[in-house]
From Swiss-Prot:
Topology in membrane: Single-pass membrane protein
Lineage: Bacteria, Pseudomonadati, Pseudomonadota, Gammaproteobacteria, Enterobacterales
UniProt keyword Isomerase present: no
Protein name: PhoP/PhoQ regulator MgrB
Parts of the chain that traverse the membrane: 6-26
The species this protein was found in: Enterobacter sp. (strain 638)
Length: 47
């Protein structure tokens, strides 16, 4: 049972990361001032 829990946890974490990066990309496209620093960092991380 514990292995299934770990698999679900990992899948949820991966989904959250994907959603977060998509959100950042949208914010960067709209040129939101608050996200400009995150966008600069985001360009160096190969998502």
């Amino acid at each position: 049972m514990k292995k299934i829990r770990w698999v679900i946890l990992i899948i949820v974490l991966i989904a959250c990361v994907i959603l977060w990066t998509q959100t950042i990309n949208v914010m960067c496209d709209q040129d939101v001032q608050f996200f400009s620093g995150i966008c600069a960092i985001n360009q160096f991380i190969p998502w």
